[in-house]
Amino acid sequence: MKKPLITLAVASALLSSPFSTVADTLIHAGKVFTGTSNSLQENVTIVVEDNKIKAVKKGFAEAQEGDTVIDLKTSTVMPGLMDMHVHLSSQHGGPQTYLERFSLNEADYALRAANYAKITLDSGFTTVRNLGDGYNETVALRNAISKGYATG
């Protein structure tokens, strides 16, 4: 009976100790536009945990063991942008986009949408509203991004 209680006590102590904390990502930013005011904040640390912003602190915080530091001290950081009118499966198309309806299949459109989602993300847009596709490829892409199978 004593062994399970000791094991439980040790496990509880470890789970509540600083050694069990999840490592954070610290972004040291020279300037930050938060969108909550018209002014820029200077020399701040953005604390990210589980891919979500946990805090924005004044000054450059020191990293704890296991933390990742991204040095953007010479950069301006801002929230991700939203594009409320995209066509991920036919973005950047010209007149040939209409002719491709006869030669491309569902998989072609899905791969194209994945490529455009990555380009859109790299351009600073973290949220988009897709306004239609022919084969539900953007629904499949959304699901793949959510599961970590694709970048977007």
Range-by-range predicted roles:
Residues A11-S12:
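Repetitive helical segments and hydrophobic/amphipathic motifs
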Residues E65, T151-G152:
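Short acidic capping loops at alpha-helix termini that bridge into adjacent secondary structure
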Residues T76-A144, Y149:
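Metal-associated gating/positioning segment near the N- to mid-region
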